[in-house]
């Protein structure tokens, strides 16, 4: 079942996030409370356990409301795909015109691409000569 996180789910979400991403509990709680807001944390529950989680951080781009998919964690591509679908659909109902994401691995990038996300830009390295700037 995909749904919004309830306060009673917080410890399980923090534990899952720490296991998957290695962040501190302080960082995770700050992300949920101050970055996304508790009302924008989505979870996938299976057999009474939290199996996946993601934040839908509210953003505005050139006056258009949308969200930033952040902290996607969990195992199983079907569970993660369902969570992304639910998050995007619910945010669209709330008026979000777009969802952006920065995948943390090639596997996550492939999952998001399968869900219709497109690469908008990529980081690239431009080599150039560096001169000492001592005078």
Feature names for model-found ranges:
Residues 43, 49-59, 68:
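Conserved beta-strand in the GNAT
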Residues 61, 102-103, 118-134:
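Conserved catalytic-core motifs of GNAT/GCN5-like acyltransferases
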Residues 83-92, 109, 113:
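A conserved short alpha-helix in the GNAT/GCN5 acetyltransferase fold that borders
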Residues 21-46:
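Active-site rim helix/loop that mediates acceptor-substrate recognition in acyltransferases
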Residues 39, 64, 69, 130:
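Short coil/loop residues immediately preceding or within conserved phosphate-binding loops
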Residues 91-104:
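Conserved GNAT acetyl-CoA-binding A-motif
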Residues 1-26:
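Short amphipathic alpha-helix that is part of the acyltransferase structural core
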Residues 68-79:
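A short, internal acetyl-CoA/4′-phosphopantetheine-binding micro-motif in the GNAT/acyltransferase core
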């Amino acid at each position: 079942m995909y749904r919004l996180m309830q306060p009673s789910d917080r410890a399980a979400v923090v534990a899952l996030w720490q296991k998957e991403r290695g962040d501190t509990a302080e960082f995770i709680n700050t992300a949920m409370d101050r970055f996304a807001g508790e009302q924008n944390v989505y979870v996938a529950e299976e057999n009474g356990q939290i199996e996946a989680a993601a934040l839908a951080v509210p953003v505005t781009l050139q006056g258009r409301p949308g969200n930033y998919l952040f902290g996607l964690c969990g195992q199983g591509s079907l569970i993660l795909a369902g969570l992304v679908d639910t998050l995007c659909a619910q945010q669209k109902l709330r008026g979000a015109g777009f969802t952006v994401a920065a995948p943390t691995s090639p596997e996550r990038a492939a999952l998001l691409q399968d869900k219709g996300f497109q690469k908008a830009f990529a980081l690239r390295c431009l080599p150039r000569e560096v001169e000492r700037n001592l005078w």
